[in-house]
Amino acid sequence: MSLTADPPACTVPAAGGSSTHKLVNGGADKLIFKIKSSNNNEYRIVPVFGFVDPSGSKDVVITRTAGAPKEDKLVVHFAPAPADATDAQAAFAAVTPAGTVTIPMSATA
């Protein structure tokens, strides 16, 4: 079971901007994920919860509002998805994360 981010890091202007990343499931099991941010004031993540099909990918959009240049990070917690799960946010509460992927975020002046 593996989950990777492509590209593996995010650089956006401190004045605001967005970046699209793919979460790629390299395994044979459907995965469920939750994304946590070290800076919820200046970053918006869509989606926060979701599923990634076996050998599939899911686009994640990172949007930054204007603010001082700063280093932050996203941590994607993931686990095998429950077989009957349809609501990722509700289902994630019932699983134990099996791994994480960290995406460093850099806001540049």
UniProtKB/Swiss-Prot annotation:
The record's section on SUPFAM superfamilies has: PapD-like (SSF49354)
What top-level branch of life does the organism fall under?
Eukaryota
Tell me which stretches of the chain form a coiled coil: none
One family name in Pfam for this protein: Motile_Sperm
Expression by tissue: Expressed at higher level in testis.
The MSP domain extends over 2-109
- TM helices/strands, residue ranges: none
Q: Which InterPro entries match?
A: Ig-like_fold, MSP_dom, PapD-like_sf, Sperm-specific_class_P
Q: What is this protein called?
A: Sperm-specific class P protein 16
